[in-house]
A protein has these predicted regions:
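Charged, flexible boundary elements
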Residues: 1-22, 29
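Covalent nucleotidyltransferase
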Residues: 17-150
């Protein structure tokens, strides 16, 4: 079961004045990947590493990514990774990624194709009471890249 839901992007218009005051101290910007939103965490019910959509639907056909992240979650069982299932080579074929990750009963061929094509790009974590700057540092420290993890 998914523990928390991710923060979604909002239109700046209504918050423009408030945000402008906040911007005086700096601003963080991340590129937007047009992939499939994915939250990865150690499940609270059965302790397996699982992946979910932003609405809580479990993604089943990305075992290669979950297996790779097992050691991370052994060390940090309460962290939730927030990112996109994406492949830059498929940026014009978004439907291909969706069709691969939405499979609820993947065949061996589906699993192999997912292994070949679907990557997880991590750009944040969900960690209570930790500001973005510290979360971004955490992602960089553990995955070696500012804003993104490529598996």
């Amino acid at each position: 079961m998914m523990r928390k839901k991710p923060m979604l992007a909002h239109n700046v218009g209504a918050f423009e004045r408030i945000l402008y005051e906040d911007w005086q101290n700096g601003l963080y910007i991340q590129p937007k990947l047009d992939g499939v939103r994915c939250l990865i965490q150690k499940d609270v019910d059965d302790y397996f590493v699982k992946a979910y959509s932003r609405t809580g639907k479990e993604w089943k056909n990305i075992d290669h990514i979950l297996k790779e992240l097992n050691p991370f979650f052994e060390k940090y069982p309460n962290v939730i990774l927030d990112g996109e299932l994406y492949n830059h080579n498929l940026k014009k074929d978004f439907e291909k990624i969706i069709s691969l990750v939405r499979k609820t009963k993947p065949t061996d061929d589906d699993r192999f194709e997912s292994y070949e094509k679907v990557q997880f790009h991590c750009y944040d974590t969900i960690m209570e009471h930790m500001p973005f700057k510290e979360r971004n540092h955490f992602v960089k420290k553990h995955f070696g890249w500012d804003n993104f993890l490529l598996l």
